UniProtKB/Swiss-Prot annotation:
Source species: Cyriopagopus schmidti (Chinese bird spider)
Annotated tissue distribution: Expressed by the venom gland.
GO MF annotation: an example: ion channel regulator activity
Name of protein: U12-theraphotoxin-Hs1a
Entry's free-text remark on domains: The presence of a 'disulfide through disulfide knot' structurally defines this protein as a knottin.
Signal peptide boundaries: 1-20
Keyword Secreted: yes
Protein family: Belongs to the neurotoxin 35 family.
Domain of life of the source: Eukaryota
Amino acid sequence: MNVKILLLLVGLNLVMHSNATGDSETNPAETLFIEEIFRRGCFKEGKWCPKSAPCCAPLKCKGPSIKQQKCVRE
């Protein structure tokens, strides 16, 4: 029983390692940069942004008046 579990773990490790080192077809434009990773408790793009909570990086709170501001990209 323990041998089967060990072999399954080794096999899974090999599969995961080959996926990590293989060529990825990820488009760099689709990936998030470090500064775009959303913090907890921040507002995302298009949401109203009161003074009590910030917009997620790299968004800024902008609008025609204080009561009509939304999180937008600069």
